[in-house]
């Protein structure tokens, strides 16, 4: 199995920096690794470093070195984003990642190249410095109608009916988020 422990040194240093210095969670750092692995797998295919018909998920990035990282251009990153929007399967099994997923991968690349230029001082040029993030549509919150609210309150029963009814009333009348409601004592 390809884990971040198998990452090339240049990526491993970046991941360690984020986990130890920046204090990011292990899960966040694992996601950074997966984003970088996807990116460098794509770069290896695009540069002809592996056969075009190679199974994407089996391409190793252990041989990625500073020279390959330095050679990445803004055009390479645009091509990668195009690949993500047209070729990669998404969570629903369809083709093409959402703008939000692509934006997260861009954030990883920005962080990686910023680390290499500003912190590690291994690069002089940051190819993602001028990269824009894809526009993400924000969905508006969906509110319950008056009838739906009444039906919800009417459905409360059980041993803790009074408590649950009060919690729901507070939730509905104050417009609390679930996380805010859970934090109440």
Residue ranges and their predicted role:
Residues 1-185:
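Conserved catalytic core of the tyrosine transesterase superfamily
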